[in-house]
Amino acid sequence: MSAAFNKISRGAGSRITVRQLLQHTSGLPEYTDAIATSIFEVRDEYRFPRDFLDAALARPAAFQPGEKFAYTNTNYIVLGLLIEKVTKRTLGEQIDQRIVQPLGLLHTYLPAPGDRTIHGKHPEGYERNPVSGELENITEQDPSWAWAAGAMISTLSELNIFMQKMLDGTLITADSVAEMQKSIHTETHSDYGLGLIGYSLSCGTAWGHGGTIPGHQTLNAVGPDGGAVTIAVTAIPTAVAKDPTGEESIRAAFEPIKEALDNLLCGS
């Protein structure tokens, strides 16, 4: 696995482990910072995953591997490329074969190149246009720029099924779940495991994750009693925050979502 990663990163990954990628302690720079632009400028463009990694590797490392935690979308791009390198199949095929089909999911998929729409009935998503300052419909977009870091499409009920079946040992082994839950405490997330966040709720620890793409944000978790909740909103915090560049303002915009998660899982 390490040899495959070293080939993908053209030698830059010789000291980075898969665990560090999953736990965001790799030190890889954020590719979205390297290609930062308004989604309104690139919504119709297809981007190749390899280009994202190249853009990230053109920048200096954020820190030495294993030194600290910093959530970085680049880690998921590398993991997606690593899956394709090792299996000789596309990421979408692997997700379908290993997750979607075994769980009988009908509305969960990784969009194919050029697919800019959400299949079936769906809510519209909105993003603040930096030019006009207004919230505008951004539902139709090419999600390739997020790829393994956030391009998946699903429904709330199927996300709940996925999370429950992963954490109860149906989809992966109990030992793998235990490894995923070996976490480190962070300033920005309660506890971060291997692609899992441990949320400290009023009724105990809930395990889940979530994600954002312009126009949509999700937060999901499985509570101590095995119940699952997924919350979706149709604008990300930076789009509705009073100060889109201020951390406190963004955090305040996200807080009601976290409170709703606690209320739904704990009945508080």
Describe the predicted segments one by one.
Residues 1-4, 162:
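Conserved hydrophobic/aromatic "anchor" residues
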Residues 210-212, 219, 234:
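Residue-level structural signal for beta-strand termini and adjacent loop
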Residues 83, 166, 224, 232-235:
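Short beta-strand segments enriched in hydrophobic/aromatic residues
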Residues 3, 7, 101, 237:
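Active-site micro-motifs of SAM-dependent methyltransferase domains
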Residues 143, 236-238:
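A short acidic/small-residue loop/turn micro-motif
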Residues 9-212:
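Short, surface-exposed loop or secondary-structure junction motifs
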Residues 239-268:
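Short, gly/Ser/Thr-rich active-site loops of penicillin-recognizing serine hydrolases
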Residues 206, 215-228:
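Short, surface-exposed beta-strand/loop micro-motifs that present aromatic residues
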